[in-house]
Amino acid sequence: MKKRVLLILYSITFGILNSQNIKYENREVWEPEPTIVSPGSSFRDAPSDAIVLFNGLNLNKWIHKNGEPAKWDIKDGYFTVRPGSGSILTKDFFGSCQLHLEFMTPVNIEGDGQNRGNSGVFLMYNIETGNGYEVQVLDSYNNRTYSNGQAGSIYEQHIPLVNASKKPGEWQTYDIIFKAPLFNKNGEVKSPAYVTIFHNGVLIQDNSEIKGFTNIGYPKYEAHPSKLPILLQDHGNLVSFRNIWLREL
């Protein structure tokens, strides 16, 4: 028993002395060196590695589902849904990303609930199936509706942590960090999608797990390509957008 105790004490003492001899330099990691990215002058401005999806001048990077050029109305550096013309989606495909966009719901209030300032940002929209992962856009300023359908919700899945909505007619921001889902070769989910969202600078979704496509009914996953378009929804309301940029992650 004494030998056992002595052996344990020796091991502890040797371990302490040995750890004291470790140089701090041995814990320093120099490679790989992070890529230099020049930030914008404010958090709203696109950094140097961003893909600008709307430059305030044209919708050249957007199309309708039928492949025709986007027909929404452009004015003074922003564009507005043309009700009935159909949703628009990016020509390019994306997976995991950091997405910044600004939106404004109509200053002239019409309707209530889901009929007021309604649109949506669909991440990884699959044209073939009509499915995607929707971040709800809505006028949620003094406009009660079901909580998992208000502004900043993962539609009918996750309620936003708080309601950070501004008044109608004021510009608002979404900063979305999206981690795309991964699928096994047999089409089963290897890793679900996750999303973090800041609404007007306020955290409203904190690494929320997306349970599947946000279409009507119980959400479920279906295997899809690793990159797909982003869609902005025509829900029949005059919602405006500006300053849209994205960083691939």
Walk through the language-model features, giving the residues of each.
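Carbohydrate-interacting regions of secretory-pathway proteins
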Residues: 20-249
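Bacterial Sec-dependent N-terminal signal peptides
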Residues: 1-20
